[in-house]
């Protein structure tokens, strides 16, 4: 009996230790993300990288793994639900149908192109899907939301999120340098940035040279892409299940529907109705990013650098080429739809 209690206490301490490590990393990532240049990468990406460094330098106690796994799975879903508080459906509606069109076109195009490229480069199927969706929709958040749909492993999820983050940072710097020669108005440049960059942090940083006009519309266009995470996640789950040969009748609980995504949509609806004060909504978004950062830390703590090198090199090249194609398409659409 006493031995059982000792084992339970040890497991409980290990679980708490795992949660504590991810929280510590998430807090460190938040403050580091406020520094020049690192703010382009954002809290989520920095959390993954710190987690990987922590594992390589310090290691993760065996008993703490249960806590880091809890963070990377359960806390992740709760964080994504709360992240819906950032999305205002009214603002998206006011932006007009052209914004919906450009978001739908770039997402569809990018998923097919990037996934096609990953097949050409013989990237593992699940990592290819994650890379495609992360590039097309909303970076790391899309990667971790789609991961359960394709039953991706933690290392595939972490590598996919890191690849998208690095690509987004590179293209953010390129956009900032190219802004004076693109020939776009601040409004058009904002649409271009919001339609083609990977993370919200990337969009805001890249649009900054165009002023508040560019940043405001860039965020709206980007959040329109984020809103499409719900249908894309469902479609990816259905397609993946069919491609893997899933047969037979399944209960509604077994359908490839990420139910937590509907929580995300519900939070968006609540925010859109104006029920919650903006100040409170802002704090909820901060909490959402903290929880997702803890999840990212948990993923990073489960990945070794050699795994990243092994899995990530070909996927990175595919994502790089796909991102170039996305940028070209976005630029063409800005002109074609009259956003100049």
Swiss-Prot record:
Coiled coil: none annotated. The chain crosses the membrane at residues 13-35, 40-59, 99-118, 128-150, 157-179, 189-211, 218-240, 255-277, 279-301, 316-338. Pfam families: Cons_hypoth698. One of its GO terms (cellular component) is plasma membrane. Keywords: Cell membrane, Membrane, Transmembrane, Transmembrane helix. It is found in: Cell membrane. InterPro entries: UPF0324_pro (IPR018383). The keyword Membrane applies. Belongs to the UPF0324 family. This is UPF0324 membrane protein BC_5174.
């Amino acid at each position: 009996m006493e031995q059982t209690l000792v084992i339970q206490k040890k497991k409980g301490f290990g679980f708490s230790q795992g949660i504590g490590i991810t929280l510590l990393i998430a807090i460190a990532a938040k403050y580091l993300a406020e520094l020049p240049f690192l703010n382009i990468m954002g809290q989520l990406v920095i959390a993954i990288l710190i987690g990987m460094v922590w594992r390589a330098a310090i290691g993760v106690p065996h008993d703490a793994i249960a806590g880091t796994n809890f963070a990377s799975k359960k806390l992740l879903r709760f964080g994504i639900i709360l992240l819906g508080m950032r999305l205002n459906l009214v603002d998206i509606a006011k932006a007009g149908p052209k914004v919906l069109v450009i978001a739908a076109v770039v997402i569809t195009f990018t998923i097919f192109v990037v996934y096609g490229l990953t097949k050409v480069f013989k990237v593992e199927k699940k990592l290819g899907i994650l890379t495609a969706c992360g590039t097309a929709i909303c970076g790391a958040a899309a990667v971790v939301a789609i991961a359960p749909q394709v039953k991706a492993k933690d290392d595939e999820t972490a590598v996919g999120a890191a690849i998208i983050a690095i690509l987004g940072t590179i293209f953010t710097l390129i956009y900032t340098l190219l802004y004076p020669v693109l020939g776009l108005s601040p409004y058009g440049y904002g649409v271009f940035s919001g339609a083609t960059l990977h993370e919200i942090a990337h969009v805001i940083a890249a649009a900054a040279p165009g002023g508040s006009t560019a940043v405001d519309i860039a965020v709206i266009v980007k959040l329109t892409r984020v809103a499409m995470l719900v249908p894309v996640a469902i479609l990816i789950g259905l397609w993946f299940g069919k491609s893997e040969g899933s047969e037979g009748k399944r209960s509604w609980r077994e359908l490839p529907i990420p139910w937590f995504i509907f929580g995300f949509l519900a939070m968006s609806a609540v925010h859109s109705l104006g029920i919650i004060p903006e100040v409170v909504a802002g704090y909820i978004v901060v909490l959402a990013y903290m929880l997702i950062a803890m999840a990212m830390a948990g993923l990073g703590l489960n990945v070794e650098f050699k795994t990243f090198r092994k899995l990530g090199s070909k996927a990175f090249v595919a994502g790089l080429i796909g991102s170039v194609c996305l940028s070209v398409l976005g630029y063409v659409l800005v002109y074609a739809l009259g956003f100049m």
